[in-house]
């Protein structure tokens, strides 16, 4: 994924953070709201390797609530268990991930 694609993913993650449905409508079978379904569809269009970058960018951009939503999505998508380590990284690691993604 090129820089333009990464920027689009970053902007998408900011939009996701603004959706109340992302914060409150997670359940065991996925999202129940229309906006949630749209997010799941967009998630499905991203390859597993790119989805990890989406998770990192969304965590950086969105904070705790979207972080939990994405963690649930990670489980629903059956990605490798070691991928969850992204969610235990401290804020400094998030800043480093952002700097690595968008070098100045």
UniProtKB/Swiss-Prot annotation:
Glycans are attached at residue 27. Residues 1-18 form the signal peptide. It comes from the Viruses. The keyword Signal applies. Keywords: Glycoprotein, Signal. This is Uncharacterized protein ORF3. It comes from Fowl adenovirus A serotype 1 (strain CELO / Phelps).
